[in-house]
């Protein structure tokens, strides 16, 4: 599936990974895995209640919110667990 990034995600991404190359690599790795296999166990993909959003884990504290569609994955937000939920 192909990833589509929102403006808000791009803005949040730049802010959260600024100066942190390790986190940058983790985010890129998990997003590449998401595009290849959204059901991979390391993503810890789960639906957020009855909303249209799904969540994946980047590491124990960082989450990315997405919307799954037929041929696209819309990447909406990135942030700390408590901020994104």
Protein language model annotation of sequence segments:
Residues 28, 47-49, 79-81:
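Short, intrinsically disordered/low-complexity patches at protein termini
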